[in-house]
Swiss-Prot record:
Protein name according to UniProt: Stress-associated endoplasmic reticulum protein 2
Keyword entries, A-Z: Endoplasmic reticulum, Membrane, Transmembrane, Transmembrane helix, Unfolded protein response
Complex formation: Interacts with SEC61B, SEC61A1 and the SEC61 complex. Interacts with CANX.
Membrane topology: Single-pass membrane protein
InterPro entries: ER_stress-assoc
Length: 65
């Protein structure tokens, strides 16, 4: 009886190994989140938007006076 149970457990372990073969994680380290836009591109965008807003304010002050 013990031998049958041992064989059954070995068969289950073997079949589990076969069904999970190839499902190995690429890395064990947690994946860090990547931004879709780089920091330099974001800084350029903020510079252009803020610069044009400041330029527009200065131009409207000159025209108003």
């Amino acid at each position: 009886m013990v031998a049958k149970q041992r064989i059954r457990m070995a068969n289950e372990k073997h079949s589990k190994n076969i069904t999970q073969r190839g499902n190995v994680a690429k890395t064990l380290r947690p994946q860090e989140e990547k931004y879709p836009v780089g920091p330099w591109l974001l800084a350029l965008f903020v510079f252009v938007v803020c610069g044009s807003a400041i330029f527009q304010i200065i131009q409207s002050i000159r025209m108003g006076m």
